[in-house]
Amino acid sequence: VPDGELFSSPIIDSVNGHIKYTASVYQGKPFEFVRLEVKDGVVQDFDSSNNEALAEILDTDEGARRFGEFSFGLNPVIDQPMHDILFDEKIYGSNHLTLGHDYEVAPNGNTSGIHWDLVCIGADVYLDGEKIREGRHFITDDLKGLNPDSLLVD
């Protein structure tokens, strides 16, 4: 499995805004897209190509509507989905906010029966109100070293 993911857990009540994910599968249920509206770390509203299945997933337990992981995909040679999450979560210029259980190595207190890595490719990303990534490229001086031209060696 290739390297190329930088992850942590968001502060449990800090996620606000909306995100639209690319195609995904969860326990055999296909989704062409998933769009979530989030306030204070909790999914408030959603839309997807399979709303019935998404509602069932989100209603698994209280933690299923919260996020257990946030990650940037950094592998410069993976540039499109392969429909295998162990590769897709590493697509350069992607990020994922994972619904459900956190990771033990980066706990935020969220527990759930689910851990669903949903990948979003090419989104603008803001942290603490500052835009740090535009599309697939980091734009702040302290993060530009994570762009492909800095990672690939001839």
For each predicted feature, which ranges?
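Metal/cofactor-centered catalytic core regions of large enzymes
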Residues: 1-154
